[in-house]
UniProtKB/Swiss-Prot annotation:
Gene label: rad-50
Organism of origin: Caenorhabditis elegans
Entry annotated with the keyword GTP-binding: no
Domain notes: The zinc-hook, which separates the large intramolecular coiled coil regions, contains 2 Cys residues that coordinate one molecule of zinc with the help of the 2 Cys residues of the zinc-hook of another RAD50 molecule, thereby forming a V-shaped homodimer. The two heads of the homodimer, which constitute the ATP-binding domain, interact with the MRE11 homodimer.
Entry GO CC: condensed nuclear chromosome; Mre11 complex
InterPro entries per record: P-loop_NTPase, Rad50/SbcC_AAA, Rad50_eukaryotes, Zn_hook_RAD50
Residues the record lists as binding Mg(2+): 43, 158
Subunit text: Component of the MRN complex composed of two heterodimers rad-50 and mre-11 associated with a single nbs-1.
Substrates-to-products reaction catalysed: ATP + H2O = ADP + phosphate + H(+)
Protein's name in the database: DNA repair protein rad-50
Amino acid sequence: MAKFLRLHIRGIRSVGDEDHDVHKIDFLSPCTLISGPNGTGKTTTIEALNFVTTGQMPTQKKQNFIHSTDVARKTRVDASVTLEFIDVKGRECTAVRRLVVTSGTKAAALAEEHTLAIKYPDGTVNTLSSKVCDFNTALLKHLGVPRAVFKYVIFCHQEDSTWPLSEPKELKKRFDDIFQLTKFVKAQERMKKIVLDFKKEMQTHEMSKQLYETHVRDKLVARQNQEECERKISKRKEETDELKERKANGQKKIEEMRTSIHELEDTLTSFKKTELERQNLKKQLSLIRVEPYFGTEEELKREIEEFRGSEGRSYGEERARIQKKIGKNNQERQELSQKKTEFENRISSLKAEVIHCQSLKYDLERLENQLRSELDLEHDADIDIEIDNAITLKIRGMSDKARMIAKNCAELQSNLRTAQEAATKIEVEMKTLQNEKVKLEKEVEQLKFKIKQGQNATAGMKDLLKKEEALRKSLADLPLLDENALTECKLKREKYLKQLDILKKKCAEAEKNAEKDREKESLKQTLSIARKKMTAYQRIYDNNWQGLIGQAPDFPWTPILSKTFHKLRNDKKIMEEDLRDVQLNVQKLETMQHQYRKQEESLTAQELKLSENIFEACSCEAEEVSEKLENLRKRLKKARKDLAPLSAKSNLYDSYIEESKSSGCCPLCDRDFKTKKEINEFSKKLENMTLSFPTEQEELEKLVSKLEKEEIIIVKAEGQANELQRIVKELKEVREKNRKLSTEMAEEKSNLSKNEKQLETVNAKLKLAEDLQTDVGVIQQLYEQTEENEKRYEQLVSESDSSDGLSYTELRKKVEDKDEEYRKIVQEGEELQKCSEERNKLQSKLNELGTHRVSLGEAAAQAGAFAEQLETKIKEIQECITAISQKRNEDLPDAQFKKDDLTRNVSSKEEEKKKAEMEVQMMKKELDQKIFHRKSLFKKVQEGGLCERQLMDKENNIATLNASLEENQQRQKRFEEDLRSFDSSHQRESILKDQLTRMIIENKIKELKRTLATFDGQINEDRITEQKQAYNKLQNELRLIGNEEVKIYTQMQEYEKQKKIAEAKLSTKECQNAESNYRDAIIELAITKESISDLTKYRNCLDASLIQFHSEKMGRVNGIIDDLWRKVYNSTDITTIRIRSDATSETSSKKVAYEYNVMMVHETGTEVEMRGRCSAGQKMLASLLIRIALAEVFGGSCSMIALDEPTTNLDESKVEGMAIVLADIIAERRGFDENGKLRGRDMQMVVITHDERLVNRITISCRPEYIYCLGKDEHGISFLSKRYPDGTVKRVNTKRRF
């Protein structure tokens, strides 16, 4: 319990700031008396106590509260108030509040640092400073009393000592502060505002929920479109890969067939050429007449060389020409060798890359085998197809295992909670038993005390009997009282009081009617303003409603607007879906049109290019190429036919000339020439015939070569002409498709424009609705308030119609007149009452002694019963000790062991669960890494395949180079042989030449025969025809595959666009956060609803709790007041007093409020308001008792009250009565009875007065150790002295010296 020890005042009001001027007050128990004349600083003590405990000063200006600098003759005065007390926890505390005032140019009064020192039982001291904490809150916490109780109850100022009987408004304010209802009312107002804000937020959350729900649906649609497009693209890619594979196989087959056809055609051509050459050689051989050379060809060539060597100079030129050819051939061989070296270097690097590719293939195969092994796939399973499903199954299996472990862990946790609850239950039971034991021990102590009281009661009854006898003698000595006059006065007073109450009730009703009239006028103005606002809103948003539903509806607008919003959103959703479909169709058609346009441009460019190539090659149109080729082949055939016999004729005529010269006869008819002249003529004739052969043969060879080149060009042009015909046909088809596509796209664009216009209309309506939405909540609230105000106005009108009678002013005048008459009657009753006070006082004491004697007798009689109860309680304590021991030694260890075992199992299972979850995460991460590694390896292997193809090409190139080098070497040998041939002699040139020609022709014929023999079984023209037909068929198939590839490519482009649109939609912030926003909106909506519900429940609960709290506290206060009044009030006119609190519902805020009145109860049981109907003594007594009761109930652990001038405005007789009342109160609230026995908590009272009679009376009753006396010296400084019972006076500090 908090207790005040001492108070030190320095530099406050008239208290000086020097050490010897400090007022040091030690608070005595039960009463501390402070006496002194008026103006010596008695009230300063109350102000200092109020200031140190609550921080409140009696004036707003600190300069007026602090000691004057002029009186102190200083420029600076330091003021402080120090309070030493024991706090609610029994700790000794010292609170110091400091102030300072300065004078001069910068005069100011400031509050300095306040400190609170707390001394703990172990001797340590902790100091709190106002710089680091809320000093007022900390101090009130240690005292355990609210601020309002200190201000209005404990340390009430002299001017406010009778506030319990003040005006109702002021009384209500102070009682609300004491009950601390203001903060609860504010809390209710805040909760009401929060509920309204939550309702508005709930509407916002509902709209947000609908919006986010639309986003979620859009996201789902976009994701479905994306997945569908990806699936279609994947399918088209597979089809494309299949087509590419078919195309590659077809191209490979075409290449093989082309090679085969060319080989067959080359073989057939070679066969025909070889056969034609053999026929020509046979004809040439038949024309040669020389005898065969009997020897080898080398011998014959040797002789020819020797013959040429005899010619000398002409063969030297031929030799130089051959050497020049040899040099050129050597240069060509060096270039070929250099190219070969480069190719070999490149092949080496490519082989290294191929080897690296093989290692990558091995790594890829090993990685795929690992994946198959880890994912339990078959050895021949297609990993690209089955890996995703296998990974899903693998992860799902591990996740199921982890979930199973988590489930087991949850079960163990549930068992652990059960075990914990069991252990907690045992501990609670032990605590309950322990509390029961403590309670029983307290009851045992009380029973022992009662037994001891019963034993002491017998001795106390003898003293009480002697006191009763003395009181009866005193009562018999008093004069008799005229009871009839007193009764008549009381009856007359009650009659006037009833009439006054009736008039007051009528006056109150009239006042209420006047208030209702004022409220009615206010409501009328409010309704007028509200209707104008609603009309203005209707006029503002008339165009919006016209655009939405055609006309403005009646109020309320919220349901109609919500329905319209819902309909517009649904329409917008449907139109957006239709618009999206049309846009997709338009994009698809535009893509196809773009592809057709590109295809048309490509075909047109090919057509122009082929036409130009054909014209450049043939100088004719494509249709004339076949005819021109046919004519050219006829000419070529004729030229080849004319060229064949010329070579044979030349050789034959040369042999005839040689034979005629050597044999001297005609080689045809063997006729001998007679003279040499005939031989020469014959030879000359043959030479003339052979002179024209070389020129003609050369011309024919040139012609044949030219025609063959033209044939090659025209054959190529014929293929181009066929390709041109195909392109022209395909171009017509493309243009026809493009035309149909343009028509379809025009229709779709028309639909698109129509849908966009409809969507714009819906968006415009939505904008109108959103504009309405901004103020519809305000309009709805205004509408609801208007309806409530109209109902209230109608109610007030009906009530005002039924009310009649006098006005409030007339009734008030009657009340004042009747009150004046009542006061006169009360004054007469007080004069009579004064006579009966002494008798009532003696009778009251006599009754108290009788009651005390009866209680002592009952205590003595009940001592035996208390002894039996004591034995029962001791047995119950022993049973509690046994039960506590059993639970502590048996039940609690078992429960703790079970809980610890389950805790260990839960910990291990938690570790196992975390390990399983970590394994799932690691497996997912490892599989993702392996899949990524496999993709990179697969890509590198594909790149390695390109290196293999390049290696094959380079190897083919180097083979070609080797063949060219071999040919170069053969040519070199031939040139060298030719060169050597020029070193031979030139004898017998003609014969040897003919013989050499013959030998060559015969060798050629033999070689041609062998060549023709190799063609047996290889010449098959039907096979060539069949292969050409198959070749054309494959080309058609490849063309169809190409068209299919273009079609698939167009579709893939369209799907890619749709996919990009879906991805763009999904990449937006709305779609990315759609689920979380929707979930948050639902959560916010649910939380808001629950918050509204909880706040409503809490408000209702708080209302009920406040009502219950108020009723309980007020009941306790009235009980204490009734008890004190009956004990200290000596008259019989007022049986008791009480505080009446009437609950009133305030219409504006719909909250419960209280109106307070102090009522006095007469002997008849009638309750009358005490304010204005009681005497000054009754008023002071009632105020004092009310403050004591409030201090008892709301003072908590601080049983303290200070009375400043309690005898103010009291006459001499009333002062004596007040002294008796205070003495009785002090006696009633003593902590110990007359025998020194503990009775309850001790009460501290501080009485500050200038009335010596009151001081003497209280001194006789309480017998304090000393009395504090205040005075002032010649300098106006207040000083404090102690006056002891023997009359000696001692100054608290030494006297001031100058």
